[in-house]
């Protein structure tokens, strides 16, 4: 039977196969907001619609289409073990089951003609199939999808593919779902050949417990190789990552080669490659060891070193279905807090790099038939329980409240993806009776916190589920907060009052990761620099309630964020002292006006302003009818500017500068320059703030006028400006709000990697200049971009410009926080 034929008894199958046969195009799942991609086709080959974090309340309409990259990253197989293959259906029965004991997956349907169903029956050994049950968390299911018959993610494949696993979400906690898995079924809904919006709808309506059937390509077999390597002047000449507590690939404790150092022993030998897995060094087994142990084993070797490595199979080369490159996917996630790609030195034999910190190992109970965290409240034991947790990068992963008047210590919040959450043993509403034998039945909050802090790496907790007591305690806290709020409003004290600011919007001027804040009183909300937040309750001095605002509307998820006061207090404590830097306003040397002095925009304009601690900037929404100017700052800005204009000349342009220099014979006034006859007139215009930047070179004035920029903007083109950070503020004052993007280098080594002709001293100078630039103008940036290659940075910048090119933008508000 042809795969597009249907069973007359199964309307659902008929509709799906009819759609597949006709290839009927419906509106993309991300709604009517999307405009044609100015950077080429974005919806076809490999472009994701980016649905992420399915919520039990609403489904975000779209998280942004990713421009097609110019180069394809090297793909590293994950080696992930896959679950059982569904059994063959019994002839004559219409209810085949997965895993033997699961619910009926195809009621009233005897369809066995689908390609994937034939593969389940073992007709294709390239794929494995798995049933995955996920419990919808606070942030939804925790993954993004792309694809469908109306918008294939992979050429000639209408499947629905997983494009992103969100850290800390339900899918990441479960650990079985992976990027590039193809979703075949959501509960009773077949999504193997449907339009994208149908898959989104199925996930949205799936309920709190979601059963997925997924298909994934089987990992290729590894090749074991023995390599004898003679150390050179740079040691063995390669970098490693991974190990217990420092997983390079989530769920995998292996030690991986992540870099081959140019000119080193490994490169000269030629057999080792990035992505190889180290199994042993000399007689020391490197499987399931800590990162530090692997480094020590490689360091404590003689000149001749015996290595045993596992090389990944070549099946996934240039394969759209291949597993993701986890090296690039996961290492960037923690850059806000520590540079995990920074070199720790060669350690004599090998360069060591710290990777994305993975969650602690999950005990077997996580995959028990009925995990504790899925039990109904009435089924959960009320007897004291013994729980053993192992601290991770986020501590134990839960918050406590109580300790007043002998009321007890209660668990108030469990961090998604943290040790407590992954164990499934601890619940919100648990009363902590003891920690490592220390009795906490009558402890104060401070005593309980101290006991948990001193508990060491392995913590034994005795807890008792007391939801009624905790509920009474919560009610008491709520009443106290209401009293404090009313008192604050009536007294007129405090920084922000709900009664005064019922709808307050701010732009975040820093990155915040809720998983790294152990002091959160309740569910937190993570955000990045430049994100717009709707603060719906700012009455508390320490914590605000807020939700994220996307280009397509407000998120339904409400979370707690640190208040402006708390951010500044913590930062001052970190710095110990507040540093002040006068803003000189000195013009940058650039291509258009080399050697300009700062005679006309000197220290007098911005001098005296403090380097304030950046937290939040109040903003308001404004409608505009022009194309916003674009200012790129930081390393490689010239290359990015050139690429934007050359690739999209119909969308980007440059303005004509002014000068008092006499016109040359081959120059055209108004085309090469606006030639100003009177120096006095140009000086007056500069003083009247009609120029965003100006300076003097060889006794002639040069400058970029606001009117020149406006002329380009009103023609519908983004005016590319090669100017200093001072120009951002001047454009804002002129009601021409630029898209200001700062390229922030990850490290000196990263700069050298992107431009191998640079010396360390040159890269160090560029890095220092970039850090000073961020310190001086950070509050004016629209976005901050980082990447491991120029291609990655360029693609991110294009996406930011597209996101910021609508008719409605967020601009600074005169309100004071």
UniProtKB/Swiss-Prot annotation:
CDD domains: GMPK, PDZ1_Dlg1-2-4-like, PDZ2_Dlg1-2-4-like, PDZ3_Dlg1-2-4-like, SH3_DLG3. The keyword Phosphoprotein applies. Coiled coil: none annotated. Residues 33-101 are annotated as: Disordered. Residues 57-69 have a biased composition (Polar residues). Required for learning most likely through its role in synaptic plasticity following NMDA receptor signaling. It is linked to Intellectual developmental disorder, X-linked 90: A disorder characterized by significantly below average general intellectual functioning associated with impairments in adaptive behavior and manifested during the developmental period. Intellectual deficiency is the only primary symptom of non-syndromic X-linked intellectual disability, while syndromic forms presents with associated physical, neurological and/or psychiatric manifestations. This is Disks large homolog 3. The lineage of its organism: Eukaryota, Metazoa, Chordata, Craniata, Vertebrata. The gene is DLG3.
